[in-house]
Amino acid sequence: MNKQRGTFSEVSLAQDPKRQQRKPKGNKSSISGTEQEIFQVELNLQNPSLNHQGIDKIYDCQGLLPPPEKLTAEVLGIICIVLMATVLKTIVLIPFLEQNNFSPNTRTQKARHCGHCPEEWITYSNSCYYIGKERRTWEESLLACTSKNSSLLSIDNEEEMKFLASILPSSWIGVFRNSSHHPWVTINGLAFKHKIKDSDNAELNCAVLQVNRLKSAQCGSSMIYHCKHKL
């Protein structure tokens, strides 16, 4: 009887294979979860760009700092923009200033060698200037300039006087008077309107340009002279 029961049990198990495949519910859910995690990792490895975008979105949503690479790129971008703005400003602004005579070296640029002036002469506005090195009396200086087809230095306006005083040493100018009782006149016989210092001294009857001012001096003194020739 016992042998029959044992045989029946073995036959029942053989005829019902589904019982052998049945597993506890707990094991089924555990295996399923593990398979899902493996599948998710494989997706992440296959799509690194999507994963990186997801991280950026997480940083943006949570208000956290971006990665160092992103900060470096942003800083370099700002530096490039500043440099480009500086270059554009230089390219546009400098020609504008030069065209409108705002350059600090405007006066120096006006005093340049010109093709219409003899060699070693400079030009300013519409005149050529000879820079003398010899010391002579006022009358000798007048004759020396005449031999150069020019006249002893003359002053037409305040701007010219300031310019010449800034680049030339003290020198005779073509202005004199016969005595302290006579007015100052140019070598062309025209009245000279600019103020000359020490005019009360009767022995000082020739004019000198000296550091942004005009001063009277003895005509027989030896001084440097400069000549002027109008174009």
Curated annotation (Swiss-Prot):
SMART domains: CLECT. Keywords: Adaptive immunity, Cell membrane, Disulfide bond, Glycoprotein, Immunity, Innate immunity, Lectin, Membrane, Receptor, Signal-anchor, Transmembrane, Transmembrane helix. One of its GO terms (molecular function) is carbohydrate binding. Expressed in NK cell subsets, in particular in adaptive CD57-positive NK cells (at protein level). Expressed in terminally differentiated cytotoxic gamma-delta T cells (at protein level). Expressed in alpha-beta T cells subsets (at protein level). KLRD1-KLRC1 and KLRD1-KLRC2 are differentially expressed within NK and T cell populations, with only minor subsets expressing both receptor complexes (at protein level). Residues 94-231 are extracellular. It is a single-pass type II membrane protein. Residues 1-32 are annotated as: Disordered. One of its GO terms (cellular component) is external side of plasma membrane. Residues 1-12 have a biased composition (Polar residues). One of its GO terms (biological process) is regulation of natural killer cell activation. SUPFAM superfamilies: C-type lectin-like. Disulfide bonds join C117-C128, C145-C227, C206-C219. Changing F102S: In allele NKG2-C*02. Residues 1-70 are cytoplasmic. Immune activating receptor involved in self-nonself discrimination. In complex with KLRD1 on cytotoxic lymphocyte subsets, recognizes non-classical major histocompatibility (MHC) class Ib HLA-E loaded with signal sequence-derived peptides from non-classical MHC class Ib HLA-G molecules, likely playing a role in the generation and effector functions of adaptive natural killer (NK) cells and in maternal-fetal tolerance during pregnancy. Heterodimer with KLRD1; disulfide-linked. KLRD1-KLRC2 receptor complex interacts with TYROBP homodimer; this interaction is necessary for the expression on the cell surface. KLRD1-KLRC2 receptor complex can bind with low affinity to HLA-E loaded with self-peptides derived from the signal sequence of classical MHC class Ia. This is NKG2-C type II integral membrane protein. It comes from Homo sapiens. The lineage of its organism: Eukaryota, Metazoa, Chordata, Craniata, Vertebrata. The gene is KLRC2.
